Amino acid sequence: MTDPAGPRGSETERLLTPNPGYGTQVGPSPAPPTPPEEEDLRRRLKYFFMSPCDKFRAKGRKPCKLMLQVVKILVVTVQLILFGLSNQLAVTFREENTIAFRHLFLLGYSDGADDTFAAYTQEQLYQAIFHAVDQYLALPDVSLGRYAYVHGGGDPWTNGSGLALCQRYYHRGHVDPANDTFDIDPMVVTDCIQVDPPERPPPSPSDDLALLEGSSSYKNLTLKFHKLVNVTIHFRLKTINLQSLINNEIPDCYTFSVLITFDNKAHSGRIPISLETQAHIQECKHPSVFRHGDNSFRLLFDVVVILTCSLSFLLCARSLLRGFLLQNEFVRFMWRQRRRVISLWERLEFVNGWYILLVTSDVLTISGTIMKIGIEAKNLASYDVCSILLGTSTLLVWVGVIRYLTFFHNYNILIATLRVALPSVMRFCCCVAVIYLGYCFCGWIVLGPYHVKFRSLSMVSECLFSLINGDDMFVTFAAMQAQQGRSSLVWLFSQLYLYSFISLFIYMVLSLFIALITGAYDTIKHPGGAGAEESELQAYIAQCQDSPTSGKFRRGSGSACSLLCCCGRDPSEEHSLLVN
């Protein structure tokens, strides 16, 4: 028979032994009451990690941040669309003017010939140079656009003139291929010829000779081909973008800096010819548009966006601050009562990443909106910077919507899968990146001189990434096939290089990557949560058995929750669906 003292002794020992458990006692004896201070802290912790729906049920607190985010999504998206239409017109205007300049100033230019457009004889080079200058002088008579000359050109070599024709060459250069000798002084000398545009209106016939003598000095240009580095033509033109009238905006005044380059650095018998432009936008003087509508609505709308984002920033920053203060209180309490040090990962559970994302989007939106107001007032011209700020902020705002979708169990699959798979995916990507960079460097140094897609490290990376996705695979092989006659060794290496890369990354790396995601998805399908073990902080909070409708969270309204929140959630899912 069992000794009766045995159970009584073990029971006594169990009761006298300190138990670090969180409020769960097994046995017939009642659990010691929880101190009011600890119960209050646990209840506040539970309320802090509640969803907006549960907070509404607990205190009758309306989800103001949720409603504000919905309003912010609408106004930010509308603002982005309005600015996008305006920015599209500005970018299109710059691109079309650049194309027009290439057809005007480059002799024999055709669309799509930027990489192959070049001069191969001395006569072709002289003709190309003189054609560009002649077209510049005759621009008002030949151009379909309305352009004006700018004296000074913004270049130090123009010396107050409208156009600068410069050749750069080595200070001393003697090359004798017959004897395999050369004598080069690498110091570069620049000689420029200034050309002034004709005055408008056209001069009288008696002044034709003087005009011809004044504007044809560039015809005396003599190029030093044996030591020539390059020839450049630089000038500036003014024009007005009238397309903005479509969006009920005041037109912008543009100044285009045009640079034509004849590049002879390689001394290979081929001189590439290129034309590049830089557009500078400034406010027009004394603008007058008949029947132009009032633009105050755009300004008022931008002010509404700034106020909305400022309010969102304050609310989210306040929530982050409350989390930080509650974290400090929890850390001090656990150390004072249980001498337990809270780990960094438990501290980070108080930091709501979604609020950080929303705060970042608010800062970007406010900055972009202020810049947009300056652009529409013609005080700024940073279209690209403004578009990046507004575009990124809109992306973050829409991504922030996922937080509220995760309160629904069926919509939480994406975030839960990412949370479970992210650590493994990051470790896996670190290993893959080492192999990928090795292939990039190898392809660039070996195949770069023979394949246009391997000419730079960025192009190599883009090409290899396309191969992983199965794009341009045949074109890449075909381009190397054409080089087989030039170097059979390089061609053989390219076959080994491409086949090994494709086999490794498509059949192994991609398969393992997909397997990691699939494994994470299979994990979250098991009962008991989103695939991750319950942390000690969540276990501590779970000891608070008070439901949101118990009235112990400061009695509030018990009305039905918002349609955008989750209703009737199972208590077992309450903590598994939390997204901090």
From Swiss-Prot:
UniProt GO MF annotations: calcium channel activity; intracellularly phosphatidylinositol-3,5-bisphosphate-gated monatomic cation channel activity; iron ion transmembrane transporter activity; lipid binding; monoatomic anion channel activity; NAADP-sensitive calcium-release channel activity; potassium channel activity; sodium channel activity
Reactions the enzyme catalyzes: Ca(2+)(in) = Ca(2+)(out); Fe(2+)(in) = Fe(2+)(out); Mg(2+)(in) = Mg(2+)(out); K(+)(in) = K(+)(out)
Task: Indicate where this protein is primarily found.
Answer: membrane
Q: Where are the transmembrane segments?
A: 66-86, 299-321, 351-371, 383-405, 428-448, 492-513
Which Pfam families does the UniProt entry name for this protein?
MCLN_ECD (PF21381), PKD_channel (PF08016)
The UniProt entry annotates the motif Selectivity filter at 469-474
Per the annotation, the residue ranges of the short sequence motif Dileucine motif are: 11-16
Residues the record lists as Phosphoserine modifications: 10, 557, 559
Which residue intervals make up region (Interaction with phosphoinositides)? 42-62
Question: Where in this protein would one find the motif Dileucine internalization motif, according to its record?
Answer: 573-578
Biological process annotations from GO: adaptive immune response; calcium ion export; cellular response to calcium ion; cellular response to pH; iron ion transmembrane transport; monoatomic cation transmembrane transport; positive regulation of lysosome organization; protein homotetramerization
Q: Share what the entry says about its subunit structure, partners included.
A: Homotetramer. Homooligomer. Can heterooligomerize with MCOLN2 or MCOLN3; heteromeric assemblies have different channel properties as compared to the respective homooligomers and may be tissue-specific. Interacts with PDCD6. Interacts with TMEM163. Interacts with LAPTM4B.
What family does this belong to? Answer: Belongs to the transient receptor (TC 1.A.4) family. Polycystin subfamily. MCOLN1 sub-subfamily.
Q: Kindly give the PANTHER family that the UniProt entry links to this protein.
A: MUCOLIPIN, MUCOLIPIN-1
- The protein in question is named Mucolipin-1
Q: Which organism is it from?
A: Macaca fascicularis (Crab-eating macaque)
